[in-house]
Amino acid sequence: MTKQTDKQIENINFDYSTYGDGKAIIEILNIGFEPLLLPDEYKIYKEIGNLKYLRNGILRTLKFINSKLLYVDEDDCYYKWLMHHKLCLEEKLDFYKEKEKYKEQIFRSLMQRNKSKTRKIYSNRDFKSEEQFRNIAIFESDLNRCFGCKDMEHSDDIISVVTYYTEIFDSIIHNGFDYKGRHFVFFTAGAGQTRCKKSTFVNEKLLNKNFNRLFCGLTPEIINEQGGMNTNKYLAYTSLCQTNTELWKNFNIDRAIVVDDIEYNIPDQKVRYIYTESPDDKKQMKYLQEEIEKCNEQLKEIKTKKQNRPRGFKRPQTEIIEERNIQNRRKALREDIQKLKSKYHRSEVRTMPVTIPFTDGFGISLRKIESSMIRLPFIKGLIAYCPRRAFVDWCSANSIPIHKVVDIYGKSYSINEIDYIFTKSQFKMWKYYNNVLDENGNIIKTGWEIYKENFKKYGCDACRCNVERGVKLNSKTNYQVLQTLTTEMTDDDILSLASYDINCLNGIGRNVQCMLNVLGANEKKNDHMNWLQKSLILYPEMLKDFYVKTLLKNTKDSMIKNFRSGKFSINGAYVFAIPDTLACLQYWFTDMDKTDLSKFGFVKDGNVSCRLFQNQEELDCLRSPHLDHAHCIRKNQVNDQTKTWTKSNGIYIGMQDIMSKLLMYDNDGDKLLVHNNKTIIKCAKQYQRKHGMIPNYYDMPKASPELISSDSLYNGIVMAYHHGNIGTPSNEITKIWQTLSPDSTEEEIQHAINVIALRCADVNFTID
């Protein structure tokens, strides 16, 4: 190696991530339940493992013997030897099963007895799999920034725990555990973690030191003083600081306010109304169940009396009549319960007003920034830029005065005093930051001012994630998008849809551009190219390299598998769903007639505005999971007027559009797949002409608040373990779509649509 080369190598600068850019990777410990078992529990657990090993060995031997017995004559001595051996093994198998069951009971009772003990991590054990004790990488977040974690370094202050046994989880959530001389306590478990039975435990000393910084001075004690809250919501909001984020530079909390959400009714909308349990229904159900329990207790007492009497004793007539009356009452109560239940899970098509939460999770920045999701303590959602000067000029041109806006705590602000407008739906804990009043009931300090004081006092951070930095029209369909068109899509349509991918596939080995496209080396379609892809663009001759040839072969095989699962390339992109920003400012800052929604905003009824596509192009808006037929086809509106307001690559949606009810999305950062594929749009239009497209509409009941404690958090998480699976209803919906075809009758299709609507409601209830 030459001196010059050595010098070049020495000059290579291996840069680490800059603090706060969101790109840092931190290594932490991830454990299962085995390291947390106490010595006596671990001993029994290993014995159970050995018994399972022996049992599985016997099962393999029995399988081998049974396969041999098929080909051996019954009179053969070898057959008799095999049968004798089989009987001995079956006896052993039964013995091991019973012993394993007995040991399992001992194991469970031991864990139950040890729930009050403080556990510790035993790292020197012979674990069943590496999943039980291994290091994992997590991305930079507000939590690990607070804890001083550094890029590409291991941190012993955050531990991810996967718990299979609820007894162990019960123990550690109440008592914590010890590791390397530090005590760890339960921190949180977000929705994504709960689905995987994961939870985050952190160094108690560091948590106490940074608690106010992470949660802006709001403690469980303050929440409990005001009646508590739903525990799973609390976990979701406290886990916001675990999101992979970058610091929001130049953010000034003093230039931010929180206003009421924009919500209104659109009259005379045709919907599929699904009845859900109301608070009165809950009370009625509870009353009926309690009355049935009383009847059961009374009948049990009568039965005990009968059993204690001598044989042949004649029962009093009054007792017989009383027993019959109680039985009849119990029967009537059960019928009432069935009547009450029969109202649930039924749908009917109605014409009724539909409530549109227009700014659900959405806020506006009057300073120029990229559209992004935001994370502040207990604040989350989407924020998009709307130019202040353009709005002021619009009001001036239309002779509309701009008045002050009132925040949710009653304080007024002019448009020049603020840069960031958050909404109540974004500020998750707004009700726990109360106004401070004097003796006469006058406001001394608003709840938002208290939040801002705490934010600055404790050094809280404003963060961003999913920042919009370039969107390419390069997306793929999935099987769900196609299955909802199964009654309309023909073989020719599928061939037309797959034509681009087929050409790319056939071009491998023949066409350089096709091969570059297949490998993702296309600047127009790939915004995140790696070094190999960039090199291929500069030097396409690298396609002859053995490694690249192997990569092409593997990519081709992968493409074929993707085709079989319905993944076809389309001219589309996943973009933020953004409410009409002009309409929002008009609603908050002017006295325009709020009963005439047609005058609000720049996006008119039946249109959307997305600058990625041409003016007057037909666009299909989709959302995942795409379970029912929800293809929202709209005309794209792009002109000189819209360009003033569309400062993002997102899709802007007008006030009169009920798309949010069809696609069931929120405006807190949900992305829609927006495309202009003519084949899909043609099939979707055919479907809607024949069978219609009616949004599901229901009132989702709210969970009751609870006091925040280790007990309530444990109960909430364990309940989520058992009731948080959306896979089952989603798979059932797929099976229903598979029963349909272009030859299906209208009656069959409408019945399927009705059943799918009910299962979609189940999925949404499970998610929320």
Model-derived segments and spans:
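Conserved small-residue
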Residues: 1-662, 681-684, 702-768
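A short beta-strand element within the Helicase C-terminal
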Residues: 671-674
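Compositionally biased, low-complexity linear motifs
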Residues: 676-703
